[in-house]
Amino acid sequence: MRTTIKVGALLAALLVVAVLVLVQDGERIIPEGEGRVELDVGEFEAFPLPDYAAAVISDGYKSYFIEVEPGIKIHVLEVGQGYPVYVQHGNPTTGLLYRKVAALLPLDRVRVIMPTMVGLGYSTKIAASEHTLDNHMRWMNRVLTTLELTEAVYAGQDWGGPVGMGALSLSPGVLKGAVVMNTGFRAPR
């Protein structure tokens, strides 16, 4: 009986320590790029992909950061030219998730924009307390407005559904079509 109580107390203490470690707020980790990428709307900080990531995409991709707020950089992959198609991954993936979709599209007629949410992939890592839906919506909207998108088709899944649709709701008139998969979101009140 005493052994059972001791083991139970030890397990409870370990659980408390594990929870404290998991929920603590960490420091912001800001990625660094190298060089510049030129787009029609301006120059951005280039990010050369590591070999393992570069090996799974075709030529023609641009990899860069958009600083949406001081110290908050979002990594963006894009490929193609033409009508903007904004795709938003879920958790815990990255914009690289949509590379196989992009490979099937007519890249001479569409521009596939694949941002990676803050906290994931090569984007800035933030404290747990900063991961709110409102923050992610605002940051992704800043990506879209920085790229000066006046219209786009959107596809998103998982957590990318509410983040992407929320980001687009902050720029009325941009959304021209949507494919929302394996997600949920609520309408504004």
Residue ranges and their predicted role:
Residues R99, N141, M165-S169:
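Short, hydrophobic alpha-helix immediately C-terminal to the catalytic nucleophile
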Residues I66, V87, P115, G156, ...:
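Conserved SAM-binding loop
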Residues R2-P84, L107-V110, T150:
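Alpha/beta-hydrolase fold catalytic core
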Residues E69-P70, M114-G156:
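Active-site loop/oxyanion-hole signature of alpha/beta-hydrolase fold enzymes
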Residues I72-Y122:
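Conserved HGGG/HGGXW glycine-rich cap/lid loop of the alpha/beta-hydrolase fold
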Residues L49, A53-A54, A103, N141, ...:
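Solvent-exposed, non-membrane alpha-helical residues enriched in polar/charged side chains
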Residues R109, T150-R189:
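Conserved hydrolase catalytic core segment
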